[in-house]
């Protein structure tokens, strides 16, 4: 949102509930309990926003009013619309289950891995504000800190991370249950970051780690890597690993402070090229301009 505002766009963030993830939201509906009361609150919000909004950019498969009505209503009102999928909201779903999104003016996914489920979507990676993140290169120490921050141990493959680190001379730090500010301070102390071992692509946690200049290990689908490198003209610096190969992928980083530093620097440069919020804002504005 801040990157759009820096480009003189009157952008507002509206959420259903504020939670810890979006303390910066301009408006939280703080929806009441009960389906009918929630629907009424959302209809009222839509009625308030419609006259003053040119582009409705929805996230995570959520809309203000029922999906069957949301996009036809916006089109009738002469408003532009975008449905921005984040990954877990589409992963494994059939084309029929996602057919409703074809009514939006455009669809966005954050990676070429997610494009498997929405082939006609624009691929616009997540952006972060790099002006607020100074690199903290990995430390030159014999026993490096491996950091892992699972939102779900099962989905992220945490038990395999624990088992792999037990075979290496490292200090494993698992970050859980903290607000983002406190968690981010711990990210700064890492020498190596392990994201996840199941999903096939990386998320915001890995992007933040790379922005800090940390080498990142996670599981990546080969085809998504190829398409990403073709689209952006830069090599994806993340080391891909599975449950079975994690130890061998970590070992060179554990044994070589120089390799940790080299890969960390390359990772920061990659984020500057692919994930800078100002670059992403320009891509969004280009998409908005092309909507009918």
Residues of each region from the PLM?
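Short N-terminal targeting/anchoring amphipathic segment
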Residues: 46-66, 82, 192, 196
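Active-site proximal beta-strand in glycosyltransferases
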Residues: 14, 55-60, 71-91, 106-109
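Donor nucleotide-sugar binding/catalytic pocket of nucleotide-sugar-dependent glycosyltransferases
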Residues: 89-90, 102-135, 141
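Acidic donor-binding loop of glycosyltransferase active sites
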Residues: 188-201, 214
